Amino acid sequence: MKNYFKFLLMFMGLISYSQQYQWTGASGNNDFFNELNWKHTATSEIPLENTINPGQIIEFELFITCEVIADDEINLGENGKINVINGQLNGHSVTGLGQVILGDSSYFNLNGSYPIGGGVTVIFESNTSWVRLNNIEPTTAYYYYHDSFYHDNQTLSYPENLRIDNYYHNGSVIRPNILSNPLLKFFSDFNLEGEFGNISNSDLFIGESIPAYLNNDISSFILKRGHMVTFAENNDGTGNSKVFIASEEDIIVEELSNYLNNKISFIRVLPWNWVSKKGTAGDIQYMNNDWFYKWSNNGSSDLNREYAPMAWGKGAADDENDVEIIVDKYKSTHLLAFNEPDDCNGQSGQYGNMCVVDTSLTYYKNLLKSGLRMVSPACRQGAVFDWLNEFNSKAIEQNIRIDVIAVHWYDWASNPENSPNANPQDVFNRFVNYLESVHEMYGLPIWITEFNANRHRNEWVHRQFLQLALPFLEETNYIERYSFFPPTTQVANFFDSNDSFTQIGELYNEFMSTKSITETRYVSSSNLDSENYNFEQIECNPDDEFLSINSLELDEEIIIYPNPSSDYININTDEEIWKLQIIKMNGEKIDLSPSGNGIDISFLSKGIYILNFNNRIIKFVKN
């Protein structure tokens, strides 16, 4: 029954033998423009030669599963449609007057500089779908395409019910922010069996609020691509816990390890956001970066950048309101803990006894309730080897998770006051040795949230140091993010007094950054657990997705009237109704209750549907 209803509605006596073709991949390649890869949904005939060509108007309705590549312009006529369900179309651009309809697990990726023509409509049928514009940044995508996306005959609006997120440096991902198909599905038994529950939003699910009464009873799960999930053993986010990131592929875990199996009482699913390594310390515009932080929890993400909130000190972590502030952050996936709490005479450590490790750990523990990926307190340069080491050891003893290590580095150990003209290569070598030592101690990804060559060094040293450091940071796998912090002496600022780039600002701005997390599916290690999961590549077979009319078991004795209908339908039966369900084209099931006026279908979009009446299957049409 797994695939029974996928594409059911298109292939069982469609209203007419219209020009509808389904993807087969029969030619042995995945070329959209090869007619041998298509067949008619009713007759199985192949389209005529040169009827599906680049730039040529296509008036067919096409149904796609699996992965298809269109490396040139798709031109859809007024009747042209592309339906994608449980598949992926990687293309250059789509133009014309037609529609692209994205169902469950459907992804439309475009590389062109002008990827979507003004007459094209994109219809989202599911929240597990996206349009990715690889070379259009979010602000440009919003400006040109914000009115091109629909759901249930309504234009989607950013940010109310449409997300536009950055896809690394130059791209954007557009997806509906609607409650529809599950983003996370979890099961009581191994191998995706037993009782199951679904989560379709970013709310916190704790203890008895976990769907299907599966508190402490989860053994396997499916996480849809473009999302992350945090699982934890205890209701406050502590205990055995782990973050899974389904960046560009679904994560399917058929057997949770003993570390989490039947121990999950805390779940939070979040939309993933694709960022490069380079960021800024402070809300600084025009630096070609994908993320920033600002030593506080009062910032906001914008279209092109993810904001990483920081709980600077005790006042941002000591009550439930502080947690709510973090939970409500739009587009934030990580939480930075305290700023230099090791300093009893300055920064956050001077307030509320935060320089005492036990005190800081108490408030850090409260932050785990946010369900975000956790970044450690950022200590002064040397304190990462003692104060933070003690913090981490006690966190491990109390089962308090740290996912990422944050560091500050200013080359203080080299007597910088007396070496304003230090050799940049020597400065760089010390920087590398420091980071390698930190990684050797903790074995976790590193965020360098503040660094420079030291405020006592001149501009030339800073600039030469950066020219050495930036390529190293990009090439080093354990460096996940970094943000250069110009010294307070203003010797190495990004901008001059006229707000023009300095040489250092120009260098930082023009340096192209790479992906912060390169894996398409990522299991985040932490101070508590470094166990990884092996994921098998799932093979897609179009024949498994498209079912022929002969395989369907329609009930010919039950009649629906009127059919087609625009508002209500009735069933010619005296049977007691114990099951009544509409099944949409994307497989979504809608449970219904009959009324005296019949079955209300006015809320449905036009199309073909299945009615499951007491497990008897009947087709009807909404017009």
Stretch-by-stretch model annotation:
Residues 21-28, 40-46, 60-73, 77-179:
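Extracellular beta-strand-rich, repetitive "passenger/adhesive" scaffolds
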Residues 149-277, 284-285, 299-301, 516-520:
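Compact beta-sheet-dominated domain cores in extracellular/mature segments
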Residues 346, 376, 441-466, 485-497:
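Active-site clefts of carbohydrate-active enzymes
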Residues 308-309, 313, 468, 472-546:
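Aromatic-rich peripheral "rim/lid" segments of glycoside hydrolase catalytic domains that contact
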Residues 1-20, 549, 611-613:
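Bacterial Sec-dependent N-terminal signal peptides
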Residues 15, 546-623:
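C-terminal outer-membrane/trafficking sorting elements
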Residues 294, 309, 339, 388-437, ...:
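Aromatic- and acid-rich polysaccharide-binding/catalytic face
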Residues 275-336, 343:
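N-terminal carbohydrate-binding/catalytic regions of secreted carbohydrate-active enzymes
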